[in-house]
Amino acid sequence: MITSSLLSRPGRTAPAGSAALRCRDRLAQRVADQVGPDGLVKAPCASRVLESSLLLRLLTVEGYAPHVRERLTRYLRNRLEHRPPDAIQGAVARAALGERLPGGCFAERALASFDHFTADRKRLMFTTLLAELGVTVFPRTRPEAFTARGQQSWLQAEMAALKIMTAYGTGTTGLLTERDWFLLAPAVRPGPVWEGNHFARLLALLALRKNPAHRGAVRRTLEAVTADLRPDGGLPFITGMDIFATAIAGLALTGPAACAHAGHRPVRCGTGPLPAAMADALATRQNPDGGFAFTPGVRQSDVDDTSYTVEFLRVAGPYRHRSAIAAAERYLLAVRNPDGGFPTFARGTPSEIAMTAAAVNALAPNPAHRTVVDEALAFLTRRRQPDGILERSWSRNVTNAVFRTTLACAAAGPGAPPGLSRAAGTTKRQATRYLASVQNLDGGWGHHPGDASDPISTAYAVIALSRDGGHPTALARALDHLVRAQRPDGGYRSRPDQAGPRPLLYDVPALADVCVLLGLAHAVGPTARPRV
């Protein structure tokens, strides 16, 4: 058991030889072993029912690759029987398998409780997909509903594909424009899947095949698509998250507490050959706009990956990577919204709590951004809820936004206006009090209060509690839970928390290890340099 009094202050480490330290060191070695020769953590995405179903549908209507259709069918039937997905993916899978389904209520029922600014678009998306699969009728909606100008690259392609499907399904093809077809062109270009996104490519192919001029290109592309199947016979949502996982792993290996901007005494910064190589690898993957994407080859930058990467580069080589850090800071400043918050992808889209907190954590160490940080903190304090729940978005657990906001609120240091410092302190205390109040009996947390505990959700909570210091008993119980959950190989298996399209979960198994290691590094300090 971890002695709770030893964890009562942020940055205080557990005694040497404790179970948590042994757990951390075994996990750190496992994470280090996952770093490839290119300096990146290998973080492939696992198969998912949605993409596998859409590919089966596409191959079926094209009469292509019967042996691949058999593999997809086995994968889907196995998932439906032994590991049923959510209602939306279940409906899509059964339709792709040729089963009769009653009406088109599945998407509406599953999305009814999804409280998010994208909910209307997601209802349109999945209703259209179910109509394409023959489950329901196509929605009668204006073409403007499919507009996604200024949004992330793959969303523009997805909405254009849905618009084309709807136009053909409702006999309104005269409403289509050259731009609609142009947005789908990357889906049939030779080479790796565009933007690493199988879902976007499949939607584009389903739409392109309706136009005889594009049928040949679609069939040629199918060979490349089927080559991307995983060994279990399914297709993933995206290729992987190597950049995202590497940035988090780098922070965990070097010691996030060492570079916290909250005024805590540094624990240790375990920089060495491996973290340096990881930082170099990330810096070379910077996009022309200064931002970073989730995996190599993706040109669409985002606040999430950019923020994590900036934090790591500051730890691993602030001078060596000063140019990359400065360019990334400029990217973040360019996407900031007038309300002081930060969106995920593009200025003008709604600001989000987790993304705003992430940007604060990336920018706060640079005094030149004090005003920007204060305005972002003001946004966060305005958005707090009385019960402490902040947001469930790209991460579907409540603990992700809580830990990131808790870290961000620590940025309201001596230089912040007094009112803002008080509000930030209240926000942090309220959020961690909420975490302690909904902790499961086994010491962990799930996606939502009452859900079974999982390592990723618990690790996020550990970060928040370790930086607050006000709930030592809850933190000790959480660390005990993570120690018990560690597998014989030193790693973790977890319910995934990443979502896309929101709110559908997708699994990148490597994230369980790197996220838990980050939590342990915050709670008990970074590990000694692992063997390389």
UniProtKB/Swiss-Prot annotation:
Keyword line: Isomerase, Magnesium, Metal-binding, Repeat
Catalytic residues (UniProt): 304 (proton donor)
GO molecular function: isomerase activity; metal ion binding
Cofactor(s) the protein needs: Mg(2+); Ni(2+); Co(2+)
Binding residues annotated for (2E,6E)-farnesyl diphosphate, in chain numbering: 121-122, 152, 154, 502
Chain residues that bind Mg(2+) 2: 158
EC primary class: isomerase
EC number per UniProt: 5.4.99.-
UniProt superkingdom: Bacteria
InterPro entries: Prenyltrans (IPR001330), Terpenoid_cyclase/PrenylTrfase (IPR008930)
Cofactor descriptive note: Requires a divalent metal cation for activity. Binds a binuclear Mg(2+) cluster coordinated with Glu-158 and the diphosphate moiety of FPP.
Binding site for Mg(2+) 1: 158
Catalytic activity entry: (2E,6E)-farnesyl diphosphate = (5S,9S,10S)-drim-7-en-11-yl diphosphate
Cleavable signal peptide: none
Each PFTB repeat, start to end: 275-317, 325-367, 428-469, 475-518
Membership in a protein family: Belongs to the terpene cyclase/mutase family.
Protein role: Catalyzes the cyclization of farnesyl diphosphate (FPP) to drimenyl diphosphate.
Name of this protein: Drimenyl diphosphate synthase
Organism: Streptantibioticus cattleyicolor (strain ATCC 35852 / DSM 46488 / JCM 4925 / NBRC 14057 / NRRL 8057) (Streptomyces cattleya)
